[in-house]
């Protein structure tokens, strides 16, 4: 199996490859997920001539770590750095993408001046505090109905031993809080063309915050879809993937 080396251990990654890619997406998943829940998305990108690279972050999937503990934003960013280096070997534009916590890491990378990303995509981005995580001393249990209404996806989550909806969230809340402290001052300085795709009925990450930022920040576009938090795995997943492909096309 392919792994990325890191001080915390070896992190598993997947590569959905096309024969002649015209772009590559480097993807960071969210809490409780792993790369294996994104096959549909990978195949949709492949059909459009785009490679997808994704890593099981620490505490998730086949990578080491306590359940649900991503470590620091810098830990996840280092994994994205390694994956970006692999994706760039094809000599095609690289698109940075993240979902939920992965979106927070992706935005940190852009604001810190990562020049390798031609553009970025974020989904389910929690840009303001999440009520369930304000008490960092407790664990969280997500209601699967908060995530998606797609019965296929919900069945996958229920029967996937690598996916989960509950874990200690001390580390997660700590790192998200860093984002919430930073974004008010720094996010208006975003310079990289970025598409936010978001479910109108997302009960975890408020779409209102994304709307407000998109109105202020010229490079940040928002496309809204009927659905909940895991919009890439919602009933409208085809439409969401198509919107992302259209956005990438416009950047090439």
PLM regions and their residue ranges:
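Active-site glycine-rich loops that stabilize anionic/oxyanionic intermediates
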Residues: 22, 30-33, 200
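Short beta-strand/loop motif that positions the catalytic acidic residue
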Residues: 190, 196-198, 202
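Conserved alpha/beta-hydrolase
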Residues: 35-37, 42-66
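Conserved alpha/beta-hydrolase "acid-adjacent" motif
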Residues: 203-209
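Catalytic active-site module of serine/aspartate enzymes centered on a nucleophile-bearing elbow/loop
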Residues: 220-252
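N-terminal cap/lid segment of alpha/beta-hydrolase-fold proteins
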Residues: 1-17
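Catalytic nucleophile-loop/oxyanion-hole region of alpha/beta-hydrolase
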Residues: 31-34, 61-90
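The alpha/beta-hydrolase serine catalytic core
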Residues: 116-189, 232
């Amino acid at each position: 199996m392919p792994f990325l080396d890191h001080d915390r251990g070896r992190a598993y990654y997947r590569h959905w490859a096309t024969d002649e890619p015209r772009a590559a997406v480097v993807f960071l998943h969210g809490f409780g997920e792993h790369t294996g829940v994104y096959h549909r998305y990978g195949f949709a990108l492949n059909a459009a001539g785009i490679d997808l690279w994704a890593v099981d972050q620490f505490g998730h999937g086949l990578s080491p770590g306590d359940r649900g503990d991503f470590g620091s934003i810098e830990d996840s960013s280092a994994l994205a750095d390694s994956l970006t280096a692999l994706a760039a070997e094809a000599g095609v534009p690289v698109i940075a993408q993240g979902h939920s916590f992965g979106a927070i890491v992706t935005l940190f990378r852009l604001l810190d001046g990562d020049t390798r990303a031609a553009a970025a995509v974020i989904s389910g981005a929690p840009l303001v505090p999440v009520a369930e995580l304000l008490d960092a001393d407790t664990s969280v249990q997500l209601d699967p109905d908060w995530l998606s209404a797609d019965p296929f996806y919900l069945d996958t989550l229920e029967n996937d031993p690598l996916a989960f909806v509950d874990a200690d969230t001390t580390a997660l809340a700590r790192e998200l809080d860093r984002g919430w402290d930073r974004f008010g001052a720094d996010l208006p300085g975003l310079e990289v063309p970025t598409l936010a795709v978001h479910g109108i009925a997302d009960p975890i990450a408020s779409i209102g915050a994304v709307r407000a930022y998109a109105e202020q920040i010229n490079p940040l576009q928002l496309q809204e879809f009927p659905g909940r938090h895991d919009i890439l795995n919602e009933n409208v997943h085809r439409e969401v993937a198509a919107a992302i492909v259209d956005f990438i096309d416009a950047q090439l």
